[in-house]
Amino acid sequence: MAAQIDLKNITVQFGQNKAVNDVSLEINKGDIYGVIGFSGAGKSTLVRTINLLQYPSAGSVEVNGTVLFKDNKLQISKKQLQEKRRKIGMIFQNFNLLNEETVIENVAFALQHSRLSDQELEKKSLHLLELVGLKDKADFYPAQLSGGQQQRVAIARALANDPDILISDEATSALDPKTTNQILDLLYDLNKKLGLTVVLITHEMDAVKRVANKIVVMEKGKVIEKGELREVFLHPQKQLTRQFVGGALQAQHILNTYNFDKLAENAELYQLVYSINDVTKSVVADLDVSLNTKASILYGNVEVLSGEPIGTLAILLNLNELKQKEAIKFLESKNVVVTKLDKGVLTND
């Protein structure tokens, strides 16, 4: 099946700086695709090439089977580009609402170029507000709403032209954790109800793991890792990805509270991550029996990743180097992802 969004060898250069450096990305219809990285990684710059709010310096952009940009030039007319852009909704950290207009008027504003009658315009705007759970706030003004409610209005407005793609550019970064989860859950519901493809730009792994099915990790303008969320989450290959995963699994809490200087000579800390569906017994108890040792459990947690329960343990092993290797091999044979915890795992450098 052809990708709904196909970015090939995208480079975006500002002067001597390559904000995006030779990035290729395929996003299928119905994906919730997380684009994650720290500030300055090139996330927003890359994603804005999808609707050509940012023209690439090199590479090609294809959306819904139409090549929009190739060979350093636009492949369709300006009018056609405007039509394509209407089918790609966007929401941002700033809600960009019209403060002097009511909620329903803010939504209807996005339909000002449509051929709908006033009655049809009102009906559609109310339907969109119902989709985001704000039909009862239609006659309110933005100042009367909470931040989360204002973002819901922005989402309703972004859906006004019946897009099949929605880009969320750090849309939850200004919200509190509870409201963030509510907005993410709304995006997930819209994805399922409308078949909406969502491109989720964020620097928070918690946001990605809550709703995304695929992920791309960016650093300094390049893609360093991408794939199915479960695979990347359970088997991170790059240091930065391990850093994001470690933070999402609260490994940072372990590192910030544990005194490494007091570890015995052979003692090592490990993070164990595993699918509850894959591991049915106590892997630590099995390890103790297998190696005739006793692992100390410092931390344990279970969280849900795209509907799948994922377990996390932080354990302390006091074994010689050979036995440490045997322990890791044993755990990995049980479908457990093992990461040695040290002060370098979660550095932001």
UniProtKB/Swiss-Prot annotation:
PROSITE patterns from the UniProt entry: ABC_TRANSPORTER_1, ABC_TRANSPORTER_2, METN
GO cellular component: plasma membrane
Zinc is among the record's keywords: no
Major location (coarse): membrane
Domain ABC transporter: 5-245
EC number, as in UniProt: 7.4.2.11
Record's keyword terms, sorted: Amino-acid transport, ATP-binding, Cell membrane, Membrane, Nucleotide-binding, Translocase, Transport
Subcellular location: Cell membrane
Bilayer topology: Peripheral membrane protein
Cross-referenced InterPro entries: AAA+_ATPase, ABC_transporter-like_ATP-bd, ABC_transporter-like_CS, ACT-like_dom_sf, MetN_ABC, MetN_ABC_transporter-like, NIL_domain, P-loop_NTPase
Lineage: superkingdom: Bacteria
Catalytic activity: L-methionine(out) + ATP + H2O = L-methionine(in) + ADP + phosphate + H(+); D-methionine(out) + ATP + H2O = D-methionine(in) + ADP + phosphate + H(+)
A GO molecular-function annotation: ATP binding
Binding site for ATP: 37-44
Function: Part of the ABC transporter complex MetNIQ involved in methionine import. Responsible for energy coupling to the transport system.
Quaternary data: The complex is composed of two ATP-binding proteins (MetN), two transmembrane proteins (MetI) and a solute-binding protein (MetQ).
Homology family: Belongs to the ABC transporter superfamily. Methionine importer (TC 3.A.1.24) family.
Protein name, as recorded: Methionine import ATP-binding protein MetN
Originating organism: Lactobacillus johnsonii (strain CNCM I-12250 / La1 / NCC 533)
Lineage of producing organism: Bacteria, Bacillati, Bacillota, Bacilli, Lactobacillales
